[in-house]
Amino acid sequence: MIKTPKIFQVGDVTITRVTEMALGGISPEIYFSGSWNPAFLEENRNCLPAGLIDGDSQLIVSIGTWVVKTPKHTILIDTATGNDKNLPLNPALANLQLPYLERLQEAGVLPEEVDYVLLTHLHVDHVGWNTRLIDGKWVPTFPNATYVFPLAEQQYYSSEASHNKENEANFNVYEESVLPVVEAGLTQTIGPEGGEFLDIFKFIPTTGHSIGQMSISLTSGGEEALFGADVMHHPFQVFNPEWNSMYCEFTEQARISRRRVLESIADRPVIYFSSHFPESAAGYVTRSGDGFKWDFV
């Protein structure tokens, strides 16, 4: 079930979650392949936040977009999976028919009103609504927006280098969801060092999950937030930073980036906006002994 989204305030910026999908019944043994330790759940079940697992102890995750409204601009951070996508090696996300644009409108945004689309990386569940299928052609969903993403991601996913076993879930994604906005002249890329954008944002390299992934920080009115991308897919990884998901392409670097992000935001008033956490998908990281813990807001 998709819940009514909260509206968050960071300085003079409002942030709203538009959820494309809420997914349950996900096996932790598979999702955290090679990392999952069932003893963690049994030992911590009574002190973990609610909403992380279903009644069968299977994971709950989400896919969606963060709508960011500043006094000057309407911005989307990541664009979920999209409808009608031809994903021959990822049938679970292929040919969807979901009311994402209707939910976006409920959040107060029409496609033509979007000024910028900021993409943390170019995986299937982050770029899908960049485009939609109109009369058999993929066209930009947000025709007046500039689509901004890491250059390293474009270079990799537009090349044969990405045609490998680890990247099967993303086959055909660049062609349907990224190339059309490139060809429309609507894109801007961020170099591998990251950098500031629109004065209030900063692209921060957090590679590992993908080759050029970047998290995006937001600072407004003396308050801070971090859009973490896929540094973590589920709150269990806050408690267990060494756990990778099955979708992390460069595993050791993914662990390094995850630990670095957790260290940077723990015990500071930085709200963390996740890409795939359940519930509100937002919260705070604090230290707990030698590790970390998570609380939703």
Model-derived features: positions:
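Active-site glycine- and acidic-residue-rich loops that bind
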Residues: 127-129, 202-214
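Metal-dependent catalytic neighborhoods of phosphoester/phosphodiester hydrolases
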Residues: 127-137, 284-285
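Short beta-strand scaffold segments in enzyme catalytic cores
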Residues: 64-68, 213-218
